């Protein structure tokens, strides 16, 4: 594991931390402050990749184990503009001095000694220069690394703000997509307004005006948040641009601050050392040798060759070291400017973060609360269903509770009666004892278990009906399934009392637990007795202790008394006494010995006891230390888990952000492809337009060429006439000239007519130049024939001038007027005024045609849309909107005839209601058709005359004609058949397909609008389908349609 280094961002100096251990974060900061001369409060520590090192994340051993290599130390003062920063060099370089031998004319020992001293000093300077170059190179690299780390820190800080901003934007977008403010109106009207519970609608639970106020506040707050987030987005984009510019500035600093540390320096230093060694060797030989001629020549060679080289190398090293120091100072100044820009950018990011964490967060919280209030509208059907299910469950529980209460109340009453009888019997026999003792004989006469008040009664059928209402309104499968599952759970609700078997089983478990606890206590007691040696039994392990005790209890007197009890001979007794005395002495020695041993053992025992007490104290201290360490360890583990969770969350956010970037990239690619395709289409359109323009230009060019040819031919003719002109004018030549002038005038007159036919007029501007202008209404007075040329020329002043000129020169013989006329015509046609005007007019007409084509297309779409909204009354096709009316069903009985069945499908019967003829007003087809086709929003009955609407007084309970009444004379039931109203071709019948959904939907309605989805054609034959008994060869259609009854 490499050692960790502290790197100063101000000077680029590094310091190793391999053998230094800092138990606290404050010790590390104090060490950095003392090492780099930075105030303790101004120290900022950053890890690689821009992570800030804080007190909570400091653990020296852990960081060393994880392989931390660098810690970057920043001075907060360099981020302040008010504090002037000036880099201070650590040392001063001195320029190498020239060799003393260079200026000396004679070679002696003093010069050689001074030269050797100069050589040693120069060698030391060169080595110092080499070290300065290397250290400066490393310092510059570290300074650039510090700049990179600081930009990474700014990037991380900005990333946190961007994540916070994106989270708010995503939340707001989700509210826009799924918020209740966009759905509650339709839900309130279509769902809550159609669900009826307890004789009221669910919509009556809310105050509509309050909901509207909440919606207005949500929209107002949403607009404010959008405006604020847009402003913050601009600030974030500006910060991103600033960060990009800072990265570019740092790259420029890296490019412009290249400090080379190549091998040339090492080679020069090695060469310098070789030459210095040679000079030193020759100098020593010159001092020692008697004959100095050879050494003098060699020394002269060194003086003229090697000494200048040494001076050149030292000067080069000095210059390079000076340049590197200047480069380092420049890098420090540029990085200080960079750090100031970083501080400004961070301040703007902090302002954005402050707004996001305060204002935006508060508004988001309020917006969320308001959305929750509106979401109650969407959740009310489900919550009301859960409310009904809970009432149903409580009702089931109450019923079961009542049953159990009745059962146990009767059982307890029997027990109470038995106890009362037992006490009465006892008091009857031993009543006299109550005079001495206080005996409580009071018992309640009956057992009373309080009942629970009845809840609101809810039946299962009511819940199912409510669920069916929700299903009919297409509320959603998850809600329906949830309510059904809750109903199933409520039906499983039960109430059980604990039995005697359960109580006895619990008691047995408690007893088993007590037994296990007693066994554990016995084991602990046995262990305690095992450690007390005095309580051991007398056996092998306790034998020595028992013998010592016996020895201590026996005394000399007792032994003498025992010896005196025997009656022995005197000699033997003397011998025995001597022996006893010896034994006594031995025993005294043993006693003294054992007493000393006992004292030693007691001393050792006291020492051991004191050591034991000390060890107990140390053990308690260690235990307390271990407790504190465990607490710190648990805290560190929690912090590590929090750190890992935070890193995982950041990783997930980064993945999400990366996924969103990929999606945006794909979207941009698709937009690029779409733009490229549109560009290709535009290029094709441009090419088509260019082709059309080229075609028109070719046509105009051809016309101009033809006119030019005519003019040229006329010029040639005139020239020929002028050449062949003689003094006497021939009559035929004059006639031919007049014919040419007439032709030229006709060409001019045709050109004027062409211009007039496309709305152009030849005229002059204020300067007298020819011009062709657009005149509105010019084409109204023209006809397609050439007879109106004079009328078109009458509106052109120039045309009138040329006409008058042409008329005036018809009978003139002089050549000059004719030449002026030709020149005037040539000037008129020579500048291509006619061609450019015609081409420009054609382009205007083409653009106008495109505009009209677009307007016609829009009109076509409007006509198609209006055609789709119109009611079709003949030639029906799928997709047409048709009027459906019920057919009089009297002829649908089994005994009806063919003629009556045919009459039931007439145009008048098709407009009859579902009631019978005797039970409803005779509504005429023209009345209903006029009501529908006129677009009236009122019902059909409102458009029927009163004389027709009041013919039938028989109505059912709903106020509608009773369609399914049973005729008292005939018990056969009547069926409703719906058909399409047709204005023409009543021979073809269009009948609605007999499906339960359609007829349930159209129940109790007099008319309906439907869009045809399918037509099935039938022709009545012998084997064909004929449920209505149409005549043979009758064509009828079975129709499927969609109805929108709202």
Curated annotation (Swiss-Prot):
The keyword Zinc does not apply. It comes from the Eukaryota. Its main location: membrane. Keywords: Autophagy, Coiled coil, Membrane, Protein transport, Transport, Vacuole. It holds the Pfam family ATG11. Signal peptide: none annotated. GO terms for cellular component: Atg1/ULK1 kinase complex; phagophore assembly site membrane; vacuolar membrane. The keyword NAD does not apply. Residues 582-730 form a coiled coil. PANTHER family: RB1-INDUCIBLE COILED-COIL, RB1-INDUCIBLE COILED-COIL PROTEIN 1. Belongs to the ATG11 family. This is Autophagy-related protein 11.
């Amino acid at each position: 594991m490499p050692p960790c280094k502290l790197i100063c961002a101000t000077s680029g100096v590094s310091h190793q931390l391999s053998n230094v251990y800092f138990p606290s974060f404050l010790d590390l900061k104090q060490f950095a402050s003392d090492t780099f001369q930075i105030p303790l409060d101004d120290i900022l520590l950053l890890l690689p990749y821009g992570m800030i090192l804080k007190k909570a994340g400091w653990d020296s051993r852990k960081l060393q184990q994880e392989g931390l290599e660098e810690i970057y130390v920043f001075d907060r003062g360099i981020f302040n503009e008010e504090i002037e920063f000036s880099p201070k060099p650590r040392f001063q370089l001195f320029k190498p001095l020239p060799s003393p031998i260079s200026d000396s004319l004679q070679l002696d020992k003093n010069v050689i000694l001074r030269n050797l001293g100069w050589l040693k000093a120069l060698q030391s300077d060169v080595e110092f220069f080499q070290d300065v170059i290397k250290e400066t190179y490393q310092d510059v690299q570290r300074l650039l690394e510090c700049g990179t780390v600081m930009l990474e820190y700014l990037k991380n800080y900005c990333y946190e703000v961007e994540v916070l901003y994106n989270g708010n934007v995503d939340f707001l977008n989700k509210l826009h997509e799924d918020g209740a403010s966009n759905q509650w109106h339709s839900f309130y009207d279509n769902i809550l307004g159609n669900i009826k519970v307890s004789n009221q609608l669910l919509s009556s639970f809310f105050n509509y005006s309050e909901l509207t106020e909440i919606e207005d506040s949500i929209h107002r707050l949403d607009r404010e948040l959008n405006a604020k987030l847009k402003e913050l987005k601009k600030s974030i984009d500006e910060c991103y641009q600033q960060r990009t510019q800072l990265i570019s500035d740092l790259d420029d600093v890296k490019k412009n601050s290249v400090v080379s540390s190549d091998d040339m320096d090492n080679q020069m230093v090695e060469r310098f050392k070789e030459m210095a060694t040679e000079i030193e060797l020759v100098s020593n030989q010159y001092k020692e040798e008697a004959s100095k001629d050879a050494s003098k020549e060699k020394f002269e060679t060194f003086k003229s060759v090697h000494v200048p080289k040494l001076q050149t190398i030292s000067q080069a090293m000095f210059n390079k070291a000076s340049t590197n120091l200047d480069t380092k100072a420049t890098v420090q100044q540029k990085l200080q400017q960079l750090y100031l820009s970083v501080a400004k950018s961070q301040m703007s990011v902090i302002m954005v973060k402050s707004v996001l964490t305060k204002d935006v967060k508060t508004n988001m919280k309020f917006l969320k609360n308001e959305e929750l209030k509106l979401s109650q509208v969407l959740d009310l059907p489900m919550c009301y269903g859960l409310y009904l299910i809970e009432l149903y469950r409580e009702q089931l529980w109450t019923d079961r509770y009542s049953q159990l209460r009745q059962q146990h109340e009767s059982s307890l009453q029997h027990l109470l009666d038995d106890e009362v009888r037992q006490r009465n019997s006892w008091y009857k026999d031993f009543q006299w004892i109550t005079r001495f003792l206080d005996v409580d004989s009071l018992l309640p006469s009956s057992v009373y278990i309080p009942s629970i008040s009845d809840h609101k009664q809810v039946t299962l059928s009511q819940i199912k009906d409510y669920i069916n209402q929700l299903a009919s309104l297409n509320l959603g499968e998850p809600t329906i399934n949830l309510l059904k599952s809750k109903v199933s759970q409520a039906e499983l609700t039960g109430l059980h009392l604990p039995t005697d078997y359960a109580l006895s089983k619990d008691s047995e478990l408690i007893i088993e637990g007590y037994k296990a606890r007693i066994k554990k206590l016995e084991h602990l007691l046995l262990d305690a007795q095992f450690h007390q040696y005095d309580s051991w039994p007398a056996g092998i392990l306790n034998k020595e202790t028992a013998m010592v005790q016996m020895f201590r209890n026996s005394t000399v007197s007792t032994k003498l008394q025992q010896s005196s009890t025997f009656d022995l001979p005197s000699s033997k007794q003397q011998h025995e006494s001597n022996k006893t005395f010896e034994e006594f002495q031995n025993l005294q020695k043993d006693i003294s010995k054992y007493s000393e041993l006992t004292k030693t053992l007691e001393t050792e025992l006291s020492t051991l006891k004191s050591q034991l007490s000390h060890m107990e104290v140390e053990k308690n201290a260690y235990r307390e230390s271990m407790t504190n360490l465990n607490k710190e360890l648990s805290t560190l583990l929690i912090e590590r888990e929090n750190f890992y969770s935070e890193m995982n969350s950041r990783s997930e956010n980064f993945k999400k952000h990366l996924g969103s970037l990929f999606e945006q990239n794909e979207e941009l690619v698709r937009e690029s492809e779409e733009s490229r395709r549109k560009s290709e289409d535009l290029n094709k359109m441009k090419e088509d337009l260019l082709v059309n323009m080229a075609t028109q230009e070719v046509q105009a060019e051809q016309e101009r060429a033809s006119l030019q040819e005519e003019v040229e031919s006329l010029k040639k003719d005139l020239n020929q006439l002028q050449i062949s002109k003689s003094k006497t004018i021939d009559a035929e030549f004059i006639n031919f000239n007049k014919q040419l002038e007439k032709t030229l005038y006709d060409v001019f007159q045709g050109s004027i007519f062409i211009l007039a036919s496309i709305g152009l007029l030849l005229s002059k501007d204020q300067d007298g130049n020819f011009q062709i202008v657009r005149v509105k209404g010019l084409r109204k007075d023209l006809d397609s024939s050439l007879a109106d040329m004079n009328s078109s020329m009458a509106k052109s002043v120039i045309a009138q001038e040329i006409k008058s000129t042409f008329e005036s020169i018809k009978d003139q013989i002089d050549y000059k007027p004719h030449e002026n006329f030709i020149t005037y015509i040539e000037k008129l046609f020579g500048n291509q005024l006619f061609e450019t005007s015609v081409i420009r007019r054609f382009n205007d007409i083409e653009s106008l045609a495109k505009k009209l084509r677009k307007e016609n297309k829009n009109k076509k779409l409007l006509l198609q849309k209006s055609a789709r909204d119109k009611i079709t009354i003949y030639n029906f096709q799928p997709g047409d909107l048709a009027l459906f009316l019920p057919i009089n069903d009297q002829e649908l009985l089994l005994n009806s005839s063919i003629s009556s069945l045919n009459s039931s499908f007439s145009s008048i019967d098709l407009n009859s209601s579902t009631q019978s003829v005797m039970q409803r007003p005779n509504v005429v087809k023209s009345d209903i058709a006029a009501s529908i086709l006129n677009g009236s929003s009122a019902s059909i009955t409102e458009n029927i005359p009163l004389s027709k609407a009041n013919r039938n007084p028989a109505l059912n309970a709903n106020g509608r004609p009773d369609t399914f009444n049973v005729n008292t004379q005939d018990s056969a039931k009547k069926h409703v058949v719906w058909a399409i109203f047709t204005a023409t071709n009543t021979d073809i019948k269009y009948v609605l397909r007999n499906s339960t959904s359609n007829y349930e939907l159209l129940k109790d309605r007099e008319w309906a609008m439907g869009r045809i989805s399918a037509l099935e054609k039938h022709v009545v034959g012998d084997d064909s389908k004929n449920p209505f008994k149409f005549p043979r060869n009758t064509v009828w259609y079975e129709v499927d349609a969609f109805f929108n009854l709202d």
